[in-house]
Amino acid sequence: MVTVEEFRKAQRAEGPATIMAIGTATPANCVLQSEYPDYYFRITNSEHKTELKEKFKRMCDKSMIRKRYMHLTEEILKENPNLCAYEAPSLDARQDMVVVEVPKLGKEAATKAIKEWGQPKSKITHLVFCTTSGVDMPGADYQLTKLLGLRPSVKRLMMYQQGCFAGGTVLRLAKDLAENNKGARVLVVCSEITAVTFRGPNDTHLDSLVGQALFGDGSAALIVGSDPIPEVEKPIFELVSAAQTILPDSDGAIDGHLREVGLTFHLLKDVPGLISKNIEKSLNEAFKPLGISDWNSLFWIAHPGGPAILDQVESKLALKTEKLRATRHVLSEYGNMSSACVLFILDEMRRKCVEDGLNTTGEGLEWGVLFGFGPGLTVETVVLHSVAI
């Protein structure tokens, strides 16, 4: 008879969890940041709020965002005027929209990732789906399983309402699933649509206005598994370790509340300061076991909560400007897509490394770090190992 220990040993993979494919998708509707203040104040019937509009213009100018993608078109907003008010009852309209669109956008990214992976989707054993947009039972994980035609026995995990740190969370979960289930192939999907947070401007809630200037829609998908099949599955990054922590003295720094008016956000001004003040502790805990203390020797993938966070982290750690290039590029081209952002940055980094003829997927370097920042204030830290190109 087999012992429990023997059975458990046979269940475990031998090598580290590995990202084997990445796919991304956005809605078709592209919004230029330079034109957005005029559009936003017009569509929300707020053009009389001239001082507030000037403030919003300055926010958009400082955002370092060039364009974003949004499911909400002018036509949709005209059909749903309560979405354009500051706090009108609108949850039903928002939910009805996103419970359909979030899995659909997730399917686009997942289809690309599965195609790059090159294996039949019947080999997918687990699905991790993450969104801050829309809640139903059965959830977006079930809807995506149906849309993709995955096996009914796929083991699903649905993550709702995590916020911007969750791109790190899904990697942590996928790593544990892949390494503790021999032969597992985990489809990870983050799909975010801002229809839950869109609302008109108000003088008393400027942090909501910050969100209107930063957030965009997008979905990203990965295939994660251990022990890639040689010549068949092509590793992109290895997931070496993953940690999560709540920053000290950060209660209420980032809050989100899903109510009748939709999802409202509250941000304290000191969010960039809280993150930059505590980030070195997370780095030390993650990299001390590897004997690494030079943060410029790493490749960097940081959730781009906004330019102020990136600037303060860069300054605090004396990072070279090029360290956050991929992060700033994704912020510029897509805005803040919450949980999907860091997965877009992984894709951008490996793409640029191939384009520039570098010898690893991590900008020619061996080790890297991925950070997720979000409500809590919660920080996810993932240690990455690059792969030779």
UniProtKB/Swiss-Prot annotation:
Main EC class the enzyme belongs to: transferase
Query: According to its UniProt record, which reaction does this protein catalyse?
Result: (E)-4-coumaroyl-CoA + 3 malonyl-CoA + 3 H(+) = 2',4,4',6'-tetrahydroxychalcone + 3 CO2 + 4 CoA
Q: Spell out the Gene3D superfamilies in the cross-references.
A: 3.40.47.10
TM segments?
A: none
EC number(s) recorded for this UniProt protein: 2.3.1.74
Pfam families listed in its UniProt record = Chal_sti_synt_C, Chal_sti_synt_N
Q: Supply the SUPFAM superfamilies for this chain.
A: Thiolase-like
Biological processes annotated in GO: cannabinoid biosynthetic process; chalcone biosynthetic process; polyketide biosynthetic process
Q: Name one GO cellular component term.
A: polyketide synthase complex
Keyword list (alphabetical) reads: Acyltransferase, Cytoplasm, Transferase
The tissues where this chain's protein is expressed are given as:
Expressed in glandular trichomes. Detected at low levels in female flowers, stems, seeds, leaves and roots.
Q: PROSITE patterns of this UniProt entry?
A: CHALCONE_SYNTH
**Which residues are responsible for catalysis?**
164
Location in the cell reads:
Cytoplasm
Family according to the record? Belongs to the thiolase-like superfamily. Chalcone/stilbene synthases family.
Q: Spell out the protein name for this chain.
A: Naringenin-chalcone synthase
**Source organism (scientific name):** Cannabis sativa
